[in-house]
Design a protein with these regions (language model features):
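Alpha-helical transmembrane segments of multi-pass inner-membrane proteins
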Residues: 15-38, 52-73, 77, 84-118, ...
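Alpha-solenoid helical repeat scaffolds
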Residues: 408-409, 439-443, 472-476, 505-510, ...
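Interfacial juxtamembrane loops and adjacent helix segments
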Residues: 114-120, 256, 267-309
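Short coil turns that delineate tetratricopeptide repeat
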Residues: 435-436, 468-469, 502, 538
Length: 561
């Protein structure tokens, strides 16, 4: 009798250890969302990839430990390779991490923690409120599903009540924080994801009876809700109208870039977008609001359009088909929380950039696997990822890039202090690791420009144009050509800068100085540029604009002598 009791306890301990190890194997890679790297430049995510590499190694260790436990206790080979609780582990990992993020945000709101951006009070572990809100919106349907799935309170046991309460508390915490983020994209994503979960949990028999009995009433309710949604949509638009118009203009230019690169642009989004916006404004057939809201974005704020532009429509269609297939499988297995999270993420991706952040990429892959196929292949996937990351050298590459980004902070201090010779030496050492970062390449090129190395400066600035659409790069290249007395090339580059962002006054000021050069003197063009510099209304007024205007007036007086 005592021996049987001991065996039962050992079996329970083994099962608990297996569940705990499985949970840790899933939660550790997803936990990269909470990793912050204040020692790096704001917005850098390479530290999260370094953490991910270590987390995957830890997950592999957990899975190996589970397999050894199951082997020791005589489990079948099929059971050893399967991961039957993968979906539950993903769901509860997201709930746990979502709760941590929600508490993090509340602490920031009340001033107990610093935010990730000086302009925003609420960012969680992210750099700004947009992605933070998107992450919370993705987790909310999972919380709702686990709150609803066990039915009424009185018919569930103590452990299920604990799950229900935990999911409910995290959901309430998220609802406390989400409105304060002011992210309309995340609000819409959260609502659609949660409505889908509620719809899938409906009592079909009861709904059919009520529909037949109160059909006219429900139709009138539907019409009322439709009008409320229209008013709400208009309110969301007028909450930040320039932001909404900016997204629309951004998508318009991205679509024009797609027409030029219908099978994808291998040079990336920034290069293709910069070209398309420059071509659009050069036609001089645009509305005033378009000039006002135009910018030099790093992302398309629409993952589908950006994927088509950079990888081509075939890859985009393939990913959509895979996602829809996983959603169908998840619905068949009644994993409505996981499916609701995927739907929320898909909606959020229409007007944001989640797939540029490690936390969303890893969560997206885990959610797809959690729809059903992860029960079979999750363990091989984790083991394969570990082999690829560690044997393939990715972790070493990420670590070297992180170290370079840390050194970049010091080099940047030299650059901003005007110690350009020392900055150039530091940038040269960092170039092999950071050669695909547009901001780094611009700083290096601008530092060389300030030091008088104009040809070398153009070499790095030309590379920066591939990774960054900022017209300031064109301005510095134009100034380099002017210093080298290649005036026609300088004019071409500065006009390209004007066309890329016509709302900026600085390139007109540079053109005015160029046309005042004795060897390239053109009084008519100078007067035109002078008029624009003096009369054009700046987007943001500053003392620099006043200085440019005074200098142009002084140049005009010199030319009159």
């Amino acid at each position: 009798m005592e021996e049987n009791r001991i065996k039962i306890w050992i079996h329970k301990i083994k099962d608990t250890a297996v569940v705990l190890l499985h949970f840790l194997a899933v939660c550790s890679p997803l936990s990269l969302v909470c990793v912050t790297t204040p020692e790096l430049l704001a917005g850098e995510t390479i530290g999260q990839w370094v953490w991910f590499g270590k987390a995957v190694l830890f997950s592999t260790g957990c899975i190996v430990a589970v397999c050894l436990l199951q082997l020791f206790y005589g489990s079948s080979r099929k059971k050893m390779l399967s991961f039957s609780c993968f979906s539950a582990c993903v769901s509860w990992s997201l709930i746990l991490l979502g709760g941590i993020e929600a508490v993090w945000g509340l602490r920031q709101l009340y001033g107990f923690s610093a935010s990730g951006h000086f302009r925003y009070a609420l960012t969680g572990s992210f750099f700004n409120p947009g992605p933070y809100a998107g992450y919370l919106a993705m987790v909310l349907p999972v919380c709702l599903h686990h709150y609803m799935q066990f039915g009424t309170w009185k018919w569930v046991n103590a452990s299920l009540k604990l799950e229900k309460v935990t999911a409910g508390v995290v959901g309430v915490l998220i609802l406390c924080v989400l409105p304060a983020t002011m992210s309309r994209s995340a609000w819409v994503a959260a609502v659609i994801g949660c409505v889908w979960v509620i719809y899938m949990h409906r009592d079909r028999r009861k709904w059919n009876i009520l529909w037949r009995r109160y059909k006219k009433r429900y139709i009138s309710y539907g019409i009322g809700i439709f009008f409320v949604l229209i008013v709400g949509g208009a309110g969301a638009f007028f909450l930040k109208p320039d932001s909404a118009l900016g997204r629309l203009f951004l998508w318009k230019i991205t679509c024009q870039a797609i027409t030029k690169y219908p099978w994808g642009c291998d040079k990336g989004f920034a290069f293709a977008y910069g070209e398309a916006q420059e071509a659009y404004f050069s036609q001089r057939d645009y509305a005033g609001w378009e000039e006002r809201v135009a910018g030099s974005p790093e992302y398309a704020f629409n993952e589908y359009l950006e994927l088509i532009l950079t990888q081509g429509p075939v890859i985009c269609i393939m990913l959509i088909v895979i996602t829809l297939a996983c959603l169908w499988a998840g619905t068949q297995f009644r994993r409505y929380g996981v499916c609701g999270a995927i739907i929320a993420l898909l909606i959020f991706s229409f007007s944001s950039y989640p797939m540029h952040l490690p936390a969303f990429i890893v969560a997206y892959v885990c959610l797809l696997l959690a729809c059903g196929i992860g029960d079979i292949i999750a363990k091989p996937v984790v083991l394969s990822a570990c082999l690829i990351i560690w044997i393939g050298g990715f972790h070493g590459k990420w670590q070297r890039e992180k170290d370079a980004c840390r050194d970049w902070v010091n080099a940047r201090m030299l650059y901003h202090a005007g110690a350009y010779a020392a900055a150039n030496a530091a940038y040269d050492k960092l170039y092999p690791q950071l050669r695909e970062k547009g901001t780094f390449l611009f700083e290096y090129g601008h530092s060389l420009h300030k030091a008088g190395f104009y040809n070398e400066s153009n070499k790095y600035l030309d590379k920066a144009l591939v990774y960054c659409a900022d017209p300031m790069i064109l301005n510095v290249i134009g100034k380099n050509y002017q210093a080298l007395r290649c005036y026609h090339w300088a004019e071409e580059l500065l006009l390209a800068s004007v066309h890329r962002l016509p709302g900026r006054i600085y390139p007109y000021y540079l053109l005015a100085k160029l046309y005042a050069e004795p060897e390239f003197l053109n009084r008519e063009k100078f007067e035109e540029m002078k008029r624009i510099v003096l009369m054009k209304a700046p987007k943001i007024h500053s003392t620099a604009i006043e200085e440019m205007r005074r200098e142009v007036e002084e140049i005009a007086k010199e030319l009159e002598k």
